[in-house]
């Protein structure tokens, strides 16, 4: 009997479709001004806090004034979380990075 890995291509595709479904649900919730209640329903307080921390990590990485170790101490995040953020930012599309710089750093320039 073949056991299916939770990371099989069929499972990965299903998870991707579920993610896209959530993203579309979130998009639609903005049209009805229900995005905050939806996110409060879908995310635990810890998950919401983690997302806020990740935004700060990306913001500080874009600013480029602190080392990853300084970020770890400043934000109380694990070095692995900061490294993942850094790696994700490096592989992000140029348009996304430019948009993030404009949104997160624009008021400070």
From Swiss-Prot:
GO biological process, one term: negative regulation of DNA-templated transcription
InterPro entries, alphabetized: Trp_repress, Trp_repress_bac, Trp_repressor/repl_initiator, TrpR-like_sf
DNA-binding residues (ranges): 68-91
Keyword tags: Cytoplasm, DNA-binding, Repressor, Transcription, Transcription regulation
Domain of life: Bacteria
Subcellular location: Cytoplasm
Presence of keyword Transcription: yes
GO molecular function annotation: DNA-binding transcription factor activity; sequence-specific DNA binding
Pfam families with a match to the protein in the record: Trp_repressor (PF01371)
GO CC terms, sorted: cytoplasm
The protein's role, per its UniProt record: This protein is an aporepressor. When complexed with L-tryptophan it binds the operator region of the trp operon (5'-ACTAGT-'3') and prevents the initiation of transcription. The complex also regulates trp repressor biosynthesis by binding to its regulatory region.
Homology family: Belongs to the TrpR family.
PANTHER family: TRP OPERON REPRESSOR
Assembly behavior: Homodimer.
Protein name: Trp operon repressor
């Amino acid at each position: 009997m073949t056991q299916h890995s939770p990371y099989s291509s069929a499972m990965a595709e299903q998870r991707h479709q579920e993610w896209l479904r959530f993203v579309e649900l979130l998009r639609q919730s903005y049209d009805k001004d229900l995005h905050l209640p939806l996110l409060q329903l879908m995310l635990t307080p810890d998950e919401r806090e983690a997302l806020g921390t990740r935004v700060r990590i990306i913001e500080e990485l874009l600013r480029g004034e602190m080392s990853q170790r300084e970020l770890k101490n400043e934000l109380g995040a694990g070095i692995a979380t900061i490294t993942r953020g850094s790696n994700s930012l490096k592989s992000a599309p140029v348009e996304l990075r430019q948009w993030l710089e404009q949104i997160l750093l624009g008021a400070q320039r």
